[in-house]
Amino acid sequence: MKELYVVNCCRTAVGSFGGSLKNTPAAELGAIVVKEALKRANVAPENVDELMFGCILTSGLGQNVARQVGVGAGLPYSVPAYTVGMVCGSGMKSVIEAGRAILAGDADIIVCGGTENMSAAPYASTDARWGARMGDKKLVDTMIKDGLWDAFNNYHMGTTAENICDVWGITREELDAFGAASQQKTEAAQASGRFDAEIVPVPVKVKKEIIEFKKDEFPRAGSTPEGLAKLKGAFPVGPEGVEDQIVHTFQPTEIHEADTRKHVQRVTAGNASGINDGAAAIVLASGEAVKKYNLKPMAKLIGWGQGGVDPKIMGVGPVPASRQAMAKAGVTIDDIDLVEANEAFAAQSIAVARELHFDMSKVNVNGGAISIGHPVGASGARIIVTLLHEMLKREDAKKGLATLCIGGGQGVATVFEKC
């Protein structure tokens, strides 16, 4: 069987909503990281067989964002590209599809990843094309509609996190403790330069000057559980009796009865991920390509998994996906030295950690999406980049797991072994 190698990878710093990257198009962010990833990998653009890139909020961006990324990065016109759409899992799904293509013998070197500018997502009119006739009309926020809204139950992703609190018995205190811990870990990581090696600067215009944007700007220094406890609930709770309406695709075993206050708001801006901008790129190659071009890979991709859950509790999608990925890789959770589990919400992160029996000292050691941010189309690739760079810094970190939940009730996971 062919071996799959991550030759190199990088990401932009993550921008806040309406922050430093708001005027940088998603395709441009993607092109910057692809160009840098190829440079770091020592792979010539003409040796790339295909580009696969995630992007969710594509309204108004023009045809095939991935193609724009590839051409913008200097790939020859002969190199095909396609845009991957699996909501939050898109960046990681691109890696899985690249792995499949290489194993099938269709390619030897594929650039994958994801990009998103949530700040630039437009508002849309749904009735203007055929004539609004008269009266005021409503605009649709495509950032919410296409990125953060459950199409099956007609409510925000935040409500699915409230549902998880109800099912798994997760308290507001647990959520705020988790959110504060994420912020504190990221604050320490930034202070020590832990992210420096994985970030490629993005030139941005500030007034009349061009500066380099190279530090995640979403983290909130000084966060504490006590401070987060003062924040108000951000999302409507799920309907009464939602626990009895959920169809479980795996049997929950770690349900706590700690919180009897069902259907009260617990999810806040402090224990949920942000709305953010950013991009990440990964160069994946076959073993044959590694030998042919004398490449120096970072890690092997040794397994992946995908799974589905009831959309009402979409955040626990990583449970079946991670189990599948680890089974394919021939490992158990005890073999995993580092975990990057995307923090869409503290609620789902806690439920996933319980069900997968995570050792929390190994999970998101430099913080996660609650502190770093969650540019939806890029996050699946971003957490792989962060995982692999952290594994390189730790001599005892041999194997790593990266996983995300996906709006609509899915999960995706990948397992890596350090070279």
Which residues make up each language-model segment?
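Beta-strand segments within the central parallel beta-sheet cores of soluble alpha/beta enzyme folds
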Residues: 6, 46-54, 80-85, 110-115, ...
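Conserved catalytic cysteine-centered active-site region
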Residues: 55-109, 152-156, 222, 229-274, ...
